[in-house]
């Protein structure tokens, strides 16, 4: 079932912890030859992605509508990134299904299974892993119960990594960043084992060396 986020049976979902719920989109219809990677730029109200395309650059201003008004968000977005117009505004939830299997014949996939804001661009990797879990369940490599537990654990690891970013705040001292830093952050023991170099296993979609690079950048304690 890949019908997206709008047709969900809400009783089968849990909310994920995340400070964002809205994105404003824009685009510049000219390429930037000097931009060869996706930028993630902190703003007073959240952060913005800047994605280079072949003939354009896409922008997405992520913020919390309960903290920042749409008018203030648009004003900061267009001024900060020198944009002429807005293409779309989307509101979203961060969530995960309690069970990726519904009935005897249906596997939830894509946004029907779960969604986490794009700070670490984890969706494709998660959905590929979900295909693996579905295969393992259908062909009895593992029980569906074990497969469901594995994929939910993976989603929680992704949430923990994203929330780790927010714990360190940004250069902005604003209501949004105060709120983001105040959110519950208590990752599992595996997180600390990998982060401290005691366990050489993948966590979420990251290896031990990814953790080391992150720690070096933020003076991890």
Label the model's feature ranges.
Residues 47, 102-106, 176-182:
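Bulky hydrophobic/aromatic packing residues
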């Amino acid at each position: 079932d890949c019908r997206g986020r709008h047709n969900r049976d809400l009783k089968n979902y849990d909310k994920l912890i995340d400070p964002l719920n809205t994105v404003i989109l824009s685009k510049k219809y000219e390429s930037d030859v000097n931009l060869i990677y996706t930028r993630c730029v902190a703003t007073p109200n959240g952060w913005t992605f800047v994605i280079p395309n072949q003939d354009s650059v896409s922008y997405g201003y992520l913020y919390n509508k309960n903290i920042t008004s749409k008018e203030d968000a648009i004003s900061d977005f267009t001024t900060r990134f020198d944009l002429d117009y807005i293409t779309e505004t989307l509101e979203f939830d961060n969530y995960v299904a309690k069970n990726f299997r519904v009935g005897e014949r249906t596997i939830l996939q894509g946004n029907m299974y779960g969604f986490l804001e794009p700070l670490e661009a984890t969706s494709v990797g998660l959905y590929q892993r979900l295909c693996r879990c579905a295969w393992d369940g259908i062909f009895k490599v593992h029980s569906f119960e074990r497969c469901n537990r594995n994929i939910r654990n993976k989603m929680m690891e992704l949430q923990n990594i994203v929330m780790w970013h927010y714990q360190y705040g940004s250069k902005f001292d604003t209501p949004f960043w105060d709120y983001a830093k105040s959110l519950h952050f208590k990752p599992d023991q595996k997180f600390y084992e990998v982060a401290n170099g005691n366990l050489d296993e993948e966590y979420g979609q990251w290896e031990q060396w990814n953790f080391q690079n992150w720690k070096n950048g933020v003076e991890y304690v």
